[in-house]
Amino acid sequence: LNPLLLLADALVLLHWLVVLFVVLSPFAFACGALLDRRSAPARSKLARYLVRAKRSPRWRIAHLLTLAWIVVNTWLGKLCFLTIWEFALRDAAGQIVTEQGFIARWLAQALYIEAPWWAFVAAYSVFFALVLLTLWWAPPDWRARPRR
């Protein structure tokens, strides 16, 4: 196995983890806000985790900055650096960029959607606006201290 191809596949997986962080975090914030507004304390581990996620300024800021970076780069017409690195590693390994292993191919097919540039700009911008709204609707606890 070529180590460059393994790194390229690892980058596809990392890219997916970033996508999941960006897309699923607002749902965690919303669920945490709904659970936080109940009078009874959250009983399950998942419920407590969601409330902590909603309240966490660090998580909220990290999410907002990640999404802002994506939106700005999309507006500028730039590819994500993870995509650029993945393609460069595949090229350096002598692999055609579209030629990937089974798992990497399926992950990449779901990740790299064919659409016009303006569609990505619109989708990312609307999503960013919705995330900004969650800061008002379900604000984090800015006074919260990090857990140790």
Model-identified regions with their sequence ranges:
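Physicochemical signature of membrane-embedded alpha-helices that form the seven-helix bundle of GPCRs
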Residues: 11-14, 62-65, 123
